[in-house]
Amino acid sequence: MQENTTKIIGVCVADISTDYNDRFFEAFKRLAHEFHFKVLFFSAFSPLYWDQKHDIGEGNIYQLIDTDVLDGLIMLTITIKNELVRKSIIEHAKKRHIPVISIEYPLEGSLSIIYEYKSTMRKLLSHLINDHGYRRINFIAGQKDNLFSEERLQVYRDV
């Protein structure tokens, strides 16, 4: 009997119905086809932002992941707003020595892929100031305590 060598990658995401997630879903499906691996999506419908009964129950979906069949796990970490849920996903994967990749958010216990927003924000603001002469620029950074929002706000203050 021949052993199946097709790799299987799990993807954990929350708030399933967003455009942000749709772009990743399409990219993962395309890459799976191109590089001959399978992808399993695990998702909560809400962003798990509030620590209410509904979110707690929904967050448990990730504990049902059969890590015995996975070769790796990818988290679209910024979609999963609850830090305890994030940590539990990593702990669940670590029990089976499954590598975890966190996209767009540094997360202990994972390899993190982080986008670099600072230089782009600096270029944008410098362009508005130097090339267009703007001196009073109103700025809305995004969510409070969000790593990238805080970085953008700091660049705004620096420039």
Which residue stretches match the model-derived regions?
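Bacterial carbohydrate/catabolite-sensing allosteric modules
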Residues: 1-50, 56-159
